[in-house]
């Protein structure tokens, strides 16, 4: 399995985790603002990766991957805020943050490799 195959699967799994976290934060913690931002950025990663696979051009492909990268970076920021304000438990934070970091590394690797 190549990085190109792994990335859509990892980003979709991450999106599912983010959706479940959003539901938990909304229902149990009564937190709506940051969790909504995280829901948007965390699910957008995989959507843009999926769109990149059907890009109309090389430029379109890279544009979608760069958007995915920015959304992943934004997701890390929201996760950090939820963790540092003690809304999100450390164990859950570390799991999601590490998954997001893996996605970022894969995206950066693909972008660098394809540009050569």
Name every feature range the model reports, one short phrase each.
Residues 1-47, 51, 55-116:
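Short, C-terminally biased terminal segments at protein or domain edges
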